[in-house]
Amino acid sequence: MEIKRALRNSWLASILACSSACLCASASNPPPLGETDAALDLLLTRKAQEILDTHRLRESKPLGASVSASVDISQRKMVIRFGPGVLPLEDDHSLEEMEQYVRNTLEAYALQAGVGEVEIVVLYEGRLYWEHFPRSVFAPLQAVPRQAGGSVLVSASHGLLRTHPGLQWEFQRPERNGILEDLITPGYADELAQLLTDRANLTVHRARRGGNDIHPDSMRPWKEMSARYHLKNLLPERTDIWHHFANSNRNDREVLDDIRARPYYANHLGVDGMLSIHTNAGDPVARGSRVHYHPSKPGDRLLADLTLCYMREIINSQDGYVEFPVARSGVAAGHGENSFATMPSVVVEVAFHTNAADAVALQDPVFRTASMKGVEKGYRLFREGKGCVPLKAEPIDGIHLPAGGAQQVDVVFEGYPQYPIELVTTNVGCPPGWKCTDSRVRIERPGAKPSQVTLRCENTGSAPIYWNTQVVDDDGVKSPPVPHWVQCIRGPGSAVASPGVHAGVEAATAG
C-alpha cells in the first residue's frame, strides 16, 4: 500500500506541477469518509472545473458555477458534486455530454493514479440529477403491447441535425482520430441487428434509417440522418415522439428532440429492449468499453453487467485485443436515451474515439464484430435469465493406460459457448523419442455428441505424457487450458480400447 501511495503521489505531483488552473471547489462539501488523497482530489476537481467552464462558455453562460470531486480510495468510489447554477430549468438533456466528459476524464485519471476502477456518483446540489426532475413515461407513448416473440430497438448514435437559427445541417460530434461517431456507429448497429436476428431470433427495429436514398430537406443520404427525421418521415402525426421540444428556443433543440425521440419510439413500438450504440469521448487518456444504465432503473444494471461480461469475453479472445480494457460493471448515468424507455435499456459506449489506440480498434472489422457479438450475447442471456459465466473447463484427472490402450475422458465445462465448439487437446510434454499427436473434437450443437476426448498410448514404453485441453467456441472464445496427464505403462499384450470410442474422432495419441 505504501509503495502504491508513493507512486501515486509522484504521478500526481508531476501532473499538478504542470497545471495552473484555479481551484474552484466548494469548501462547504465535507470530505468523504475512508482513505482519501488530497492531491488526487485536487487534480480531479481542477479537471472537472476546466470541463464545466468550457461547457458554460460554449453555452454562452456566465462562469462561476463550481464543481468538486473526491475519491474514497478504500471503497473505490468517486463523488462529483456540481454546485448551484448548473441545472437547467427543465430536463432537456443539455448536460449529458458535459457530465459524461467529466465522468470519463476523471475516471481515467483515477485509473492512472492507481486507484483502479471506481464507482462514480454525480450530484447536483446534493441530489442525483433525475431526483430534480421526477418523471413518469406517459402510457399513450406505448401504443403497441409487447409481444412474447421478442423484439428490440437498436439505436445508432447521433447523425445529421439541423441547427438554429441558421438552419445548417451539422453532425453532432466532431471528427477525432479519423472517426466521426455519427457515421461509424451505423455499421456497428447493422452488425448487431443481424446478430440479434440470427442468434436470438428477435425482430429488430432501427432508430435510424439506412440506405443511400436522399433525405429531401437536407439533400444528404438517409444513412447520415439522425433518428428524429426518420421518425418524422415514418410517423408524421406523432409529433409527441419526434418534436418533444417544440417550444424550446435553444439553437440545438432538434438535438434534444433526437435524444428524446429514441426512447419514445421504443415505447411506441412496445419492444422488449433498447440497445443504444455509441463511441465515447473524454480526455485522450480515457479508453475502453463502457455500458451505462439509468440510476432510476436499477433493474437494468444486470443487463449492463452482462453486456460487459460477454463483450470482455469475446473481445479479449481476439488476436490483438487480449488486453483491450472492458469495464467490470455497468455505470449508472443519466442518459435521456434510456431514462425514458419503459423497457430494459442500456447505452453501449464501444470505445473512445478520442483515444488513438481505441480509434484504431473502432475501425477494425474484427473488433466491430467481436464487440457486437458480446452485446448480442449479453442481451440474449439477460432475456434467458442467465448470468455472467465465462467459459471454463473443469479439472481433468490423470489416467493410467497400458500400451495400445485408449480411454475417453469427459471434458466438463461451464459457460455459454457459441456452437459449434471444439475440444482442443495439445501436448505440452512428450518423452524423448516418442511422437505425441494433438487432437480436436468438433461438436456441432449442444448434445450432438458427448463432451469427451480420447487419449491413447501406442508406445510400448512407460512414461508420463502431459496435455492441455481447452474448449474453443465459434466466436474464438477459449477456456483457460486445463493441464492433465496420461501415464503410459509397459505391459504384456495389448489393451483393448474402452467401449464407446467413436470412429472419426481424432485421439490425442502418444507413441
Identify the residue ranges that each predicted region occupies.
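A short, glycine/acidic-enriched catalytic loop
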Residues: 166-177, 280-306
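Short edge beta-strands and adjacent turn/loop segments
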Residues: 52-83
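Short, hydrophobic beta-strand segments
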Residues: 449-461
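Active-site-adjacent mobile loop/cap segments within catalytic or ligand-binding domains
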Residues: 276-288, 292-293, 323-389
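Active-site histidine-acidic residue metal-binding/catalytic motifs
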Residues: 139-263
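Short beta-strand elements
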Residues: 476-508
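Short catalytic/ligand-gating loop segments at beta-alpha or beta-beta junctions
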Residues: 245-257, 316-339, 391-396
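A short amphipathic beta-strand at an alpha->beta junction
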Residues: 99, 103-135
